[in-house]
A protein has these predicted regions:
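Short hydrophobic core segments
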Residues: 7-9, 180-189
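An anion/pyrophosphate-binding glycine-rich loop and adjacent beta-alpha core
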Residues: 37, 212, 218-325, 386-392
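N-terminal Rossmann-fold NAD(P) dinucleotide-binding loop
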Residues: 15
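Conserved redox-cofactor binding core of oxidoreductases
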Residues: 95-177, 188, 232-235
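Glycine-rich loop(s) and the adjacent beta-strand/alpha-helix scaffold that form part
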Residues: 184-238, 242, 371-379
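Conserved N-terminal glycine-rich FAD pyrophosphate-binding loop of Rossmann-like flavoproteins
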Residues: 35-67, 71, 238
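Glycine- and aromatic-enriched mobile tails/lids
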Residues: 1-5, 21, 25-27, 36-37, ...
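Short beta-strand to alpha-helix junction loop
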Residues: 74-87, 121-139, 150, 199-207, ...
Length: 501
């Protein structure tokens, strides 16, 4: 007989921080990830953490910028929590050994990014912030005696008994599947980028968390709001698309068309530093009418400030000091997700969520640059503390976990269904992308239903992705307005409502 422990699904910044917080509260924890610990979108983050630490800045100013970027949909209280608790989380990261970039005076170097009114972005290793932070937290998690790590172990479904989630059915890389009983399950599975043909997300970002939550009746919110990063390196057929960080534009790079015209200025007076949804649409228009390029030739210290991007560009025979960089938008981030309260509880008892998979209300219709890692830290911390408190207040009898014959096995049907997924990605990009309409969304719904009908029943991974694609499409069709990351050609921007689809 074993006492059930909290199970955390995912090892991005939200998953690792939740595990560390629970363990620091004395709570033994299990962390499950379908690949290795380092395989997450967090580890790929080139941008930094937005936090109000500089002179003339404040959490209230950071909150104002966040609310302005959200296009009227962010929850002011969630945003207040995000920006006011952020500095404490950064200081905790420093105490754990994280090393952020500093200036000659020894102070944290603060960068400027789109739609921020103050320089407040801290970086680690120039453009390798995510890798540096995940490396630090991974070491903490691997060494902690209260944290058990199950790598290369896939969560097939949530175990839902009675009125609550009580565990996860898992499928290891080798061996039989089994049920892992849990005192609570925390989803920290990241985003949905692999539902699209062009994305900056790693291949593990297959919308698992949304599908798992939906299957047990947890509410999803604002899933129609998807952010397309304006400056992915344009390399047709490459998945994932290499990212050229927002920080490059913050350092002075310009967006130009084939004539050298700064087209972003025609969309918004802030030009390259306008909110991402505006810049992405401007880049898409330029790309469709001759091409869009990022001109970083004026950044003399580019290789020193952006070593990772410099190396990536060199692999594609581009030198940012001499060449224009061809760019195009790519699916980057999901603003909505599993609806949670401000402590990470979903609408289904026993199920929690943190990070990109969750909808806390901090992003609204459009995320402010570099608020994603911050959200992962702040709300994972709140979830860990609240869950530890809840577990101390309750007493549950030991239960046993073991093999369960109903767990899906890997029959190879998903591999055989790859052509279906490829068609789904192209369909979503063409019809549920930066520009949508009633006609495109209806077409996508019909085609996704057809693809689901053509998919073998035992291809459960494929069915989960098709399910989430249909949910996103339906939510987008029901939201009859244009706002933030959701733009409909048949509903031009006008008076905005607060209701969500």
């Amino acid at each position: 007989m074993t006492t059930p422990r909290p199970v955390i699904v995912g090892t991005g910044i939200a998953g690792l921080w939740t595990a560390w917080r629970l363990a620091s509260e004395g709570q033994a924890t299990v962390v499950v990830t379908k690949e290795s610990l380092a395989d997450s979108a967090s580890a790929w983050a080139q941008g930094g953490i937005a936090v109000a630490l500089g002179p003339g800045d404040s959490p209230s100013q950071h909150a104002a910028d966040t609310l302005a970027a959200s296009d009227g949909l962010a929850d002011p209280e969630a945003v207040r929590i995000l920006t006011s608790e952020g500095p404490s989380r950064v200081y905790e990261l420093l105490a754990l050994g994280a090393r952020f970039d500093r200036g000659p005076d020894g102070r944290l170097r603060l960068g400027l990014e789109a739609a921020h009114t103050r320089p407040r972005i801290i970086h680690a290793g120039g453009d390798r912030t995510g890798a540096a932070l995940i490396g630090c937290l991974a070491q903490v998690v691997r060494c902690h005696p209260l944290i058990e790590l199950l790598e290369h172990t896939e969560v097939v479904r949530l175990v839902d008994e009675g009125d609550r989630v009580t565990g996860v059915a898992v499928l290891p890389g080798s061996g039989a599947g089994y049920v892992l009983r849990a005192s609570a399950v925390v989803l920290a599975t990241g985003g949905v980028g692999q539902l699209y043909a062009v994305t900056t997300n790693p291949r593990v970002a297959t919308a698992d968390g949304w599908a798992l939550a939906h299957h047990v009746g947890a509410q999803l919110r604002d899933i129609e709001f998807l952010q397309f990063h304006p400056t992915a390196l344009k390399l047709p057929g490459v998945n994932p698309a290499p990212l050229v960080s927002e920080a490059v534009r913050g350092a002075g790079a310009l967006l130009v068309d084939r004539t050298g015209r700064r087209f972003a200025l025609e969309t918004d007076a802030r030009g390259e530093l306008a909110p991402r949804d505006m810049v992405a649409r401007a880049v898409a228009v330029a790309d469709a009418t001759g091409g869009a390029w990022l001109d970083a030739r004026g950044i003399a210290d580019f290789p020193a400030v952006f070593p990772g991007i410099t190396a990536m560009l060199a692999r594609h025979r581009l030198d940012p000091l001499h060449d224009l960089i061809p760019v195009a938008p790519a699916l980057h981030y999901a603003m909505g997700g599993v609806l949670t309260d401000l402590q990470g509880r979903s609408t289904r008892p026993g199920l929690w969520a943190a990070g990109e998979v969750a909808s806390t209300g901090v992003h609204g219709a459009n995320r402010l640059a570099s608020n994603s890692l911050l959200e992962g830290l702040v709300f994972a911390d709140r979830a860990g503390r609240a869950l530890a408190t809840d577990l101390r207040a309750q007493s549950s009898p030991p239960v046993s976990g073991g093999p369960e014959t109903a767990i899906q096995r890997d029959t190879g049907a998903d591999a055989a269904s790859e052509p279906i997924l490829a068609e789904m990605r192209e369909l979503m990009t063409a019809n549920v992308g930066l520009q949508r309409s009633e006609g495109s969304l209806l077409h996508a719904e019909q085609e996704l239903t057809r693809l689901a009908g053509a998919t073998p029943l035992d291809a459960w991974r494929t069915h989960n992705q098709l399910l989430v694609a249909r949910l996103i499409t339906t939510a987008a069709r029901r939201r009859r307005e244009s706002r933030g990351g959701h733009r409909r050609s048949d509903y031009p921007p006008a008076a905005l409502k607060r209701e969500t689809a």
